[in-house]
A protein has these predicted regions:
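Catalytic cores and adjacent flexible loops of soluble metabolic enzymes
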Residues: 1-129
Length: 129
């Protein structure tokens, strides 16, 4: 997707572009997190583009990496109980128990680890000699 694509004159408030590998489960090596980085760079030129990631992988690793690549939205399937009849049961996060809370905590931790694009000196960097 290039900037030229958006020059057709269609007005939208926000345009969410999510990288998605359409497999259940999607192998982590097929996540293409670099596409999220491309959408992030595109969002710097086109302010209403919101980069994101549609997580069809198992766990939170790819979603955390998407945050590091600039994703501002993560889409993840959720479930209540066993839904083995569905095609996404293996990748869905269970809403009961701690699984969903842990997934969200991982995302929030990734956001903190990424920090901002502004270089700052943290208290942890001040050495006491």
């Amino acid at each position: 997707i290039s900037k030229n694509y958006f020059e057709v004159g269609i007005e939208v408030k926000d345009l969410y572009l999510l990288q998605c590998t359409s497999a259940y489960p999607a192998p982590q090596e097929d996540a293409q997190i670099g596409v999220v980085r491309h959408y992030y760079n595109l969002s710097k030129d086109i302010g209403n583009v919101i980069p994101g990631f549609s997580s069809h992988d198992i766990g939170s690793t790819c979603s955390m990496m998407a945050i590091a690549a600039g994703a501002r939205m993560i889409e993840k399937h959720v479930k209540l109980g066993n839904v083995a009849w569905s095609h996404f049961d293996e990748v869905a996060v269970e809403l009961g128990g701690d699984k969903f809370k842990d997934f969200v905590s991982d995302i929030r931790r990734a956001e903190k680890i990424v920090g901002s694009e502004d270089k700052v000196i943290h208290d942890s960097e001040h050495h006491k000699y």
